[in-house]
Amino acid sequence: MEGQRVEVDGGIMEGGGQILRVSTALSCLLGLPLRVQKIRAGRSTPGLRPQHLSGLEMVRDLCGGHLEGAEIGSTEITFTPEKIRGGVHTADTKTAGSVCLLMQVSMPCVLFAASPSELRLKGGTNAEMAPQIDYTMMVFKPIAEKFGFTFNCDIKTRGYYPKGGGEVIVRVSPVKRLDPINLTDRGSVTKIYGRAFVAGVLPLKVAKDMAAAAVRCIRKEIRDLYVSIQPVQEARDQAFGNGSGIIIVAETSTGCLFAGSSLGKRGVNADKVGIEAAEMLLANLRHGGTVDEYLQDQLIIFMALANGISRIKTGSVTLHTQTAIHFAEQLAKAKFTVKKSEEEEDATKDTYVIECEGIGMANPHL
């Protein structure tokens, strides 16, 4: 598909891997030849890292495209996409690079493949600077499926920083079109639940301490709901290396989902990890939006592709979300508006409505 190359400045706005994920996925979907320059230009280690490289190679393989300049440390790539193919595709970061970020770049593409896809993704399942796989399963999946597609995700092995070694298998069936979504009614919080985990040599007491500290923190603000956080010792044969962490999810009467999460680090008290996750959840419940700060940017590409007008209500719009909107407008020509929420209960809050007129992308194979 040789045509006019679309030029993307990889150094603007969020200036990191997200620009690559959004622009290469849209390039693949829309058949747009792409050049991305100044990749991660402002980062302490500029250029492609292993997880970005494996994401790029995966998109190339999904469509049998042509990729140049793709090596560790490279600050410029060119990508020429071809037709999206279903079937089995493997990506391995060979590090603790996040499998969830690999999913972010590949999922929109395979929805428009000719046949079902199986994505074998290897790396970190519960990694820093990325959604944990539990977030992807507990929050992203049920909300993203409102766009009218389904996927399942089988966690074979969990992998942690610094070794990685995790593997998930994602199965996705293609769709003709994506439905628009309207998530503007928050409802009231009806359930709070979660899991605190330890893996490898770490004792279960660490998970129990994280869970107990999180519950105490939430109770100070939300007194009338039972908070159920399960402490879990990951099975030895299903986890590689040592790790710990927690995710807590709040569900509302209208089916909205919010989360707070945190990972354990050497030398950091378990209580502190639990409290950090609890405080993140509480902050995400205060703004009155229908999605948390980590879901908002993940929905933008689907809103851009959907057949109709989508609306989501958010707290303050993150830089990641602003970046995703910028590139969805530049590449897909979707039209977004971001307005302060005009509802009375939001008057004193930092609450916004993101609206998008999607392009109604149709799967040419179905």
Curated annotation (Swiss-Prot):
Tissue distribution: Detected in retinal ganglion cells (RGCs) (at protein level).
Gene3D superfamilies registered for this protein in UniProt: RNA 3'-terminal phosphate cyclase domain, RNA 3'-terminal phosphate cyclase, insert domain
Reaction(s) catalysed by this chain's protein: a 3'-end 3'-phospho-ribonucleotide-RNA + ATP = a 3'-end 2',3'-cyclophospho-ribonucleotide-RNA + AMP + diphosphate
Matching InterPro entries: RNA3'-term_phos_cycl_insert, RNA3'_phos_cyclase_dom, RNA3'_phos_cyclase_dom_sf, RNA3'_term_phos_cyc, RNA3'_term_phos_cyc_type_1, RNA3'_term_phos_cycl-like_CS, RNA3'P_cycl/enolpyr_Trfase_a/b, RPTC_insert
GO molecular function: ATP binding; RNA-3'-phosphate cyclase activity
NAD found in the keyword field: no
Cell compartments where the protein resides: Nucleus, Nucleoplasm
A Pfam family assignment: RTC
Domain of life of the source: Eukaryota
EC number(s) on file: 6.5.1.4
CDD domains: RNA_Cyclase_Class_II
Binding site for ATP: 104, 131, 294, 297-298, 320
List of catalytic residues: 320 (tele-amp-histidine intermediate)
One BP annotation, GO: RNA processing
Protein family (similarity comment): Belongs to the RNA 3'-terminal cyclase family. Type 1 subfamily.
PANTHER family the UniProt entry points to: RNA 3' TERMINAL PHOSPHATE CYCLASE, RNA 3'-TERMINAL PHOSPHATE CYCLASE
Protein name stated in the entry: RNA 3'-terminal phosphate cyclase
Name of the encoding gene: RtcA
